Amino acid sequence: MTILAIDIGGTKLAAALIGADGQIRDRRELPTPASQTPEALRDALSALVSPLQAHAQRVAIASTGIIRDGSLLALNPHNLGGLLHFPLVKTLEQLTNLPTIAINDAQAAAWAEYQALEGDITDMVFITVSTGVGGGVVSGGKLLTGPGGLAGHIGHTLADPHGPVCGCGRTGCVEAIASGRGIAAAAQGELAGADARTIFTRAGQGDEQAQQLIHRSARTLARLIADIKATTDCQCVVVGGSVGLAEGYLALVEMYLAQEPAAFHVDLLAAHYRHDAGLLGAALLAQGEKL
């Protein structure tokens, strides 16, 4: 069965055909509409999928935000603008006349990463550290999404009750500290206004403040991983995202995790897939997993 897989992100929309062999073909990409209106998103999705839909039997969507009853929600509604409650599944079914599923992009990526693992692994957690912090949980060989689509949103667990306010409305979330946005927001002095990429570059050049910001992020993530081990007893944690895969970052996380009691240690792995994990995971789910 060939799946028309779609990835909806904050800056880009991607689509591709993915067969039973897992090969990605005819990949297309468009910018996410800046206007954040339902009409603009529908038009962009139509342009994206129209050349591909005749070659597919199902549609699978991996999207930023929370997917509940086929519609788009978010922990921080302001991130979606006019797209809050956008009917993703219904829209794609109308555009393509194909059966459609939708899932959070980090949950989809977690499923792709799980399928790439070697050995007898039944329980794993995927964490993406990028602009935000997201994740997905596989338990007993099954992806956990939850009845409301919230499962795996581990970036919104508490890291510091006296920390910065997160976009979700809580104070001191992991995302508000460890993410690329969190790293940049904490920069002061000559680093004020710099993005995470610049801060990583400066850290590599020996800038003390930049190094401290990255260590703060890695330490926060290590504590989250210890909490995850305590709550899931997972066999491994896979780390991805632009921050998670930045040079030297995972080694720092491993160093701080080693400082936790041994019961909370767990194998850390770098993500196998990068940009297209959401596309592939959604397609794999559409080919055999009931959501």
Swiss-Prot record:
Residues noted as binding ATP in the record, renumbered to the chain: 5-12, 132-139
Binding site for Zn(2+): 156, 166, 168, 173
Cytoplasm keyword on record: no
Keyword check for ATP-binding: yes
Disulphide bond pairs: none
Record GO biological process: N-acetylneuraminate catabolic process
GO molecular function annotation: ATP binding; N-acylmannosamine kinase activity; zinc ion binding
InterPro entries, sorted: ATPase_NBD, ManNAc_kinase_bac, ROK, ROK_cs
The protein's annotated pathway: Amino-sugar metabolism; N-acetylneuraminate degradation; D-fructose 6-phosphate from N-acetylneuraminate: step 2/5
Pfam families the UniProt entry points to: ROK (PF00480)
EC number: 2.7.1.60
Domain of life: Bacteria
Keywords carried by this UniProt record: ATP-binding, Carbohydrate metabolism, Kinase, Metal-binding, Nucleotide-binding, Transferase, Zinc
Gene3D superfamilies per UniProt: 3.30.420.40
Catalytic activity: an N-acyl-D-mannosamine + ATP = an N-acyl-D-mannosamine 6-phosphate + ADP + H(+)
Chain's role: Catalyzes the phosphorylation of N-acetylmannosamine (ManNAc) to ManNAc-6-P.
Entries under HAMAP family matching the protein: ManNAc_kinase
Protein family (similarity comment): Belongs to the ROK (NagC/XylR) family. NanK subfamily.
Subunit comment: Homodimer.
Protein name: N-acetylmannosamine kinase
